[in-house]
A protein has these predicted regions:
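A short, acidic, amphipathic alpha-helical segment used as a generic capping/interface helix at domain edges
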Residues: 288-310
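Iron-sulfur-cluster electron-transfer modules
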Residues: 1-176, 180-187, 360-366
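Local cysteine-cluster metal-coordination motifs and their immediate loop/turn environment
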Residues: 1-10, 88-93, 122-131, 135, ...
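A polyampholytic, Gly/Pro-enriched intrinsically disordered region
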Residues: 137-140, 217-233, 279-292, 353-366
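Short, aromatic/basic amphipathic alpha-helical patches
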Residues: 171-178, 252, 323-330
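Short, flexible loop segments at boundaries between secondary-structure elements
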Residues: 181-222, 264-269, 328-365
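Short, surface-exposed connector motifs at secondary-structure boundaries
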Residues: 2-3, 149-154, 229-231, 303-310
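Redox- and metal-dependent alpha/beta enzyme cores, enriched for Fe-S-associated oxidoreductases
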Residues: 106-112, 119, 214-218, 227-288
Length: 366
């Protein structure tokens, strides 16, 4: 936010990153950053989960989807020759509410018949090298292109994550590119060419989904989200570092009937900090987290009072974890969700049974 208002256009985040790297070089860092980075380097994801664990979790999600909708979705893993490699933060596999967002991806891809694959090697979109050193950014990011080449995919699709996308948008091509073995991304469903991803060959999921909606490729019933009164938090990296303002809002407005923006000076490029990004989400920092996130919480409290908001949407895995704690402290009664969880609630799937609950098992309005 400082960078938006700085009269000299100085990117404060870059300065902070260099400061962190210098501290790391003299041996000063925190375990909440170092352990996920080490796990990712060793096993491919922050949590250190082995391939069998990832497979089990995705199959559990497929079971839950079938229970809710009556539709059995595929779980493609390490599929050679798939059109698209899908990369998402590992929190979406293992941590609520991210698991509901991941279920949303799986339902969407099944419904449109997307030829895609998950990977158990490149099983992490996030990159805690961003909070450690540029060398570690490069090492952890390299596995994405390596796996895309091994599997022989055409291009890469990325899930809802914040710092993951600063790395992809700002560093990926110069650190590990050019990815000449991949094709310029073209949606196999709509034919849309994602020219902005010409260099990285990697498309953000909200761009992909917004394009599907704009071209009439999805059947949505926003009434299935009538029990949700939503506001939206612009996550710092997708918003300020990438300019992804309209795509998530376009999805939201097509997937629910009750959407309320927070005050204009607290959203889009002027969005407030979640209070616990950049590897600061550990419990030892709890007081600082609650203080740092208070401006965002007060903006949410305002729309709760005015419009009865009960859900905070975002497109960042760290936000989904940290904002949950922030809301519990400052604005009890407001829960956090990903945009593709909202979409999945509204998605009408071919052959589905009559749905009586949303993905969380909460009853939906008739």
């Amino acid at each position: 936010r400082c960078s938006v208002f700085c009269p000299y256009g100085i990117d404060q985040a870059e300065i902070t990153m260099i400061g962190r790297e210098l501290l790391n070089l003299v041996g000063c860092n925190i375990n909440w950053v170092l352990e996920p980075a080490a796990n990712c380097f060793r096993t491919g994801n922050h949590l250190g989960i082995q391939p069998g664990g990832i497979k089990d979790m995705l199959e559990f999600m497929a079971d839950d989807i079938e229970d809710r909708t009556g539709v059995r979705v595929d779980v493609p893993l390490n599929k050679k020759g798939a059109d698209i490699l899908f990369i998402t933060p590992s929190a979406d596999y293992f941590a609520d509410p991210g698991t509901y967002t991941c279920m949303g991806y799986m339902m969407l891809f099944h419904e449109i018949g997307l030829n895609y694959t998950f990977s158990t090697y490149a099983s992490e979109g996030g990159n805690f090298g961003l909070f450690t050193s540029h060398d570690m950014i490069k090492r952890l990011n390299a596995k994405i292109y390596a796996e895309a080449k091994r599997l022989g995919v055409k291009w890469i699709l990325g899930g809802e994550c914040g710092h993951m996308w600063r790395v992809i948008h700002q560093y990926m091509d110069t650190m590990n590119g050019p990815a000449d073995f991949l094709m310029e991304p073209v949606s196999p469903i709509t034919g849309t060419r994602f020219e902005n991803a010409r260099a990285t060959k990697m498309v953000h999921i909200t761009e992909f989904t917004a394009d599907l909606i704009a071209n009439g490729k999805l059947k949505l019933d926003p009434r299935k989200n009538d029990h949700i009164r939503l506001t939206f938090h612009d996550s710092c990296n997708p918003a300020r570092a990438m300019g992804l303002f309209e795509e998530p809002r376009y999805i939201i407005k097509n997937a629910c009937n009750h959407f309320f923006e927070m005050a204009e000076d607290t959203i889009r490029e002027k969005t407030f900090c979640c209070g616990a990004g950049a590897g600061l989400g550990n419990d030892e920092n709890m007081e600082m987290r609650m203080r740092g996130g208070m401006p965002r919480a007060m903006a949410v409290r305002d729309v709760v009072k005015k419009h009865g908001v009960n859900r905070l949407g975002c497109i960042c895995a760290i936000d989904r974890a940290t904002l949950t704690t922030l809301m519990d402290y400052w604005v009890p009664g407001v829960s956090v969700m990903g945009v593709h969880e909202l979409l999945a609630n509204a998605l009408i799937m071919t052959g589905e049974k009559k749905r009586t609950t949303d993905l969380r098992g909460d009853e939906i309005s008739e």
